[in-house]
Amino acid sequence: MHCLGAEYLVSAEGAPRQREWRPQIYRKCTDTAWLFLFFLFWTGLVFIMGYSVVAGAAGRLLFGYDSFGNMCGKKNSPVEGAPLSGQDMTLKKHVFFMNSCNLEVKGTQLNRMALCVSNCPEEQLDSLEEVQFFANTSGSFLCVYSLNSFNYTHSPKADSLCPRLPVPPSKSFPLFNRCVPQTPECYSLFASVLINDVDTLHRILSGIMSGRDTILGLCILALALSLAMMFTFRFITTLLVHIFISLVILGLLFVCGVLWWLYYDYTNDLSIELDTERENMKCVLGFAIVSTGITAVLLVLIFVLRKRIKLTVELFQITNKAISSAPFLLFQPLWTFAILIFFWVLWVAVLLSLGTAGAAQVMEGGQVEYKPLSGIRYMWSYHLIGLIWTSEFILACQQMTIAGAVVTCYFNRSKNDPPDHPILSSLSILFFYHQGTVVKGSFLISVVRIPRIIVMYMQNALKEQQHGALSRYLFRCCYCCFWCLDKYLLHLNQNAYTTTAINGTDFCTSAKDAFKILSKNSSHFTSINCFGDFIIFLGKVLVVCFTVFGGLMAFNYNRAFQVWAVPLLLVAFFAYLVAHSFLSVFETVLDALFLCFAVDLETNDGSSEKPYFMDQEFLSFVKRSNKLNNARAQQDKHSLRNEEGTELQAIVR
């Protein structure tokens, strides 16, 4: 096997000759340089993973830690120079602040003495005798570890080694496993210092960790909804399409209503004091505005395209007939979903470890502080690029596999005898020859996605700094341009993958050939394909709507302690990727079928010498659709001619 890249098509005289569209048996590796680049990129990701394992400590974020470097709820290793470190805290799972009503921040560090305790004091303790009694009865020692409970009332150092009196009643909260004071005045001071002055990245990571079970449950909900949508499209009827569109409309309106209701609830809540709550309120307003705009656009499109429902049902029935030639195509997304879940879990674990990476430094008094390591922010950015590029690569592999299977089944003369194992055959061709092409296509998508994220971040930053309307307008225009480019590249990539599956050419050659042949035959199927893609997109919107609604209801209960807007965005992103990985089966099959149809028209004429590969049902469907489009075009021209020939009347004043 010679991996030399793409072939150039030239005649014997050296002049370019016309592309011969035929599925290739003998292939060459394509875009190998891009595959090598992806390998180098993943070498960097593996280095970051190893570094996060060595330097990170996600447990400190998840379980909390005391002032001496001990992680609560765990058995710890000693820190050199800290005599009270290295203790077994297996039974002491809660973080207790000895001066919870008067926390202070000096520089970037929280000036506090914290201990790991087995229980939080649920009643106020007014004297050292009560602190001693609480320790003897509950086994929860609220003074520094070096002081025995017997000496709480006898040692002259007890005042400095025990909590400031009175000790307010407190209750353990799942986030950080901290003992949170319950008296109103202490709670307000405690929360404003502890939560508002924590680094934003750590607050986000803590929100993700505290809601990890909810996030996982919502991903499972997105999986169930995606499966339901996939089987709806598999056995689609006109009635199901009407029910489906009604559900989409109700879902959009319902989510918009809930978001505006939550914003109204926040604005009328006089108890909001934390920055996290204010951030949540701003994010809810942003979500509400964006969802309202999307809802309005989609409702207009649904109203305009409502008359094409019958053609859509026929289109999906033809698609299902193609899928029946390779029925295991419907199970391909399960493998994609499993790989995506594994990668996302690994990515989040590394992110948490990076967020907690720090070097232990012993301060005076034997206390331990963790200083952030240099370069962590750059690693976090590199890690984020890895999330986008690798996720797109996994989804692109699925698109290439499905396109290859459709190509194999389409270019088969014996329709009653489909080829054996088309999916495995397509997967093997992808793995051995065309991984570089998929890497290049996914890289182009990532190059557009990353600036979109940066523009969105800068737009939010400008909004907070109250910059002028012109700058915000320019950023919105940039975001819209990147969005349009992203959608165009997605469509171009899909057709390029199908062309690579047919001809075995590299990405750029395939994209150019696909663009030429689709432009030449666009009159046959552009409107049908666009409406089919629109219906599939509505299916993805339905999955995201109901998943986000579940997230709103779940996260809103803990809104006082979480920056839940970011976990909700993460849930929406994962829900869309899950829905896309499942429903894109139909989208990929549709695009591949129409490209194969265009190739069939280009290379055959339906005669006995050059018969079409397509079946009669597909051909008659395209003809009916073209007649409908031509009739509407003629009707529009006729109405325009009538308007042009209308006699001008005098203006009566």
UniProtKB/Swiss-Prot annotation:
InterPro entries: Choline_transptr-like. Residues 632-653 are annotated as: Disordered. It is a multi-pass membrane protein. One of its GO terms (cellular component) is plasma membrane. GO terms for biological process: phosphatidylcholine biosynthetic process; transmembrane transport. Glycans are attached at N136, N151, N412, N503, N521. Residues 634-644 have a biased composition (Basic and acidic residues). Pfam families: Choline_transpo. Keywords: Glycoprotein, Membrane, Transmembrane, Transmembrane helix. Coiled coil: none annotated. It comes from the Eukaryota. The chain crosses the membrane at residues 34-54, 213-233, 243-263, 284-304, 334-354, 384-404, 534-554, 563-583. Its main location: membrane. GO terms for molecular function: choline transmembrane transporter activity; transmembrane transporter activity. Disulfide bonds: none annotated. It is found in: Membrane. Belongs to the CTL (choline transporter-like) family. PANTHER family: CHOLINE TRANSPORTER-LIKE (SLC FAMILY 44), CHOLINE TRANSPORTER-LIKE PROTEIN 3. This is Choline transporter-like protein 3. It comes from Homo sapiens.
